[in-house]
Amino acid sequence: MIPLRNAKRFFYKTLEQPGYAFRVFSRRLAASFYYNLGNGRSSYPEAITLFLTHRCNLRCQMCGQWGEGGITKKQSAQYIQEELSLNELTVLIDNVSSFKPNITLFGGEPLLFAGCVELIKYIKQKGMHCLMITNGSLLENLAGGIVESGLDELNVSLDAGQQLHDEIRGMPGIFERIIAGLEKINYFKEKGHKKKPLINLECTITKFNYQYLEQMLEVAKKEKANSLTFHNLIFLSRSIVDKQKEFDKLLNSSSLDWEGFVFEPGIDPKLLEEKRRAILSKKHDFSIDFYPNFSCAELKDYYENPCYLPSTQDHRCLSPWLVAYIFPDGEVRPCLNLSYSFGNVKEEPFLKIWNNSQARHFRAILKDNKIFPACVRCTELYRY
C-alpha cells in the first residue's frame, strides 16, 4: 500500500496535506482487499489521470511521446487533435464527484487545452484534490487564474539550469519562460495570501543531465519550491518490448506506446549515486527525494540490467485497482502505455466502466501474472 521506500514521500504529504494523505491510505487499504479477493473487481479509484490533450509545444529529447523516439509524433493529425470538450469533462467530474478521487491533469501539455483553468475550478468546486503536471512554458500568462482556481499542486518539469535545460528541451529561452511563470505563481500566491498551489519541481534523470543534478537545488530554492523530485529514467530493451507483445495477443491490445522508451540509458550509476549522496547529505527548505528510491546496489542493477526488479519490491502491480487513465478520446485505460480500454466515457458513465467485464478481465489476467514484462520499468509499480 505504502511501500517502505516511499515512506519519506508519504510522510511529507501527510504533513502538508493530512486530509489528502488519509484518503490515499484508506483507498489503498480497500484496493489491497479487492486485489486479494481475486475476482477482478475494485473499490473506487484513488486517482484519475485526465490526459487533456496529446498536443505539446516542446520536443524534450527523452520524452516517450514527443522526444527523439517518441510515438505520438508518428500519429495522424486527427489522433493528435482529438480531445474531450470542457462540457464532456465536467460531466465526467460530476459522475465521479460522489467518491472524490484525486484528479491529475496531464498531457501532452495540459495548458494547451483551452478550458484547463475552468476545469480546475470545477474540480475544486466539487471538493476534489487536483494536481497538474506541466512543462511550465505557458504558466506566466495563466498564473493568476491558476492560483485563483484553487489548484492544490503544480508539478513543473525542469531538467537543470538555464543552458542545459534549454538544450534538453529543444527550445532556446524556455527556461526563462518557465521561471517567469513560477515567479508569477508565487506573486499571486503572496498577493492572495494563499499557500496553494504547492510547487513541486520534477527532474527526470537522463544521460544529458545526471552529472549536473545539483543545479536543480538552487532553482528549487529560488523559486520557493515545496519539493524537488529526481525521477530515475524510464527505458526499455528491445527484448522486453518483444515479450510484452506476447501479452498484447492475450489482451487483444497494443503496447505500441512503449516503443518510445526503447533506448540505452547512457548513465553511469556509480557517478549518479555519488551525486545522489551529495544532494541528500545537505539540508534544504524543501523536501528532496529520488524516485523510485533505490539503494546503491539497486540503482546499479536498475541501469545495467533492463529486466531488474529489486528483491525488496513486491512483484505485483496494484495500479489498475487504484488509478484510471482517461485519454483525450475518452478511452478509460488501466495503464499509461497499453491500448487496452475498459470503455469510453463518451458512451457511458465512468462508474459503469470501472468494474465492467473488460475491467475485471484485465485485472484477473494481471493478477494471475503478477506483472507484465514492461512493468519492470513503469514507475507505477513502485508507487503502491
State the predicted function of each range.
Residues I2, S149, E153-R316, L322, ...:
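Radical SAM enzyme [4Fe-4S]-AdoMet core and its adjacent flexible, acidic
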Residues F10, A31-S32, G38-E46, W66, ...:
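Flexible mid-to-C-terminal extensions adjoining Fe-S/redox cofactors in radical SAM and related proteins
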Residues L112-F113, L139, T206-N209, G343:
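Alpha-helix N-cap/loop-to-helix initiation residues
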Residues G67, G107, L158, N232, ...:
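Residues that line or immediately flank small-molecule/substrate-binding pockets and catalytic motifs
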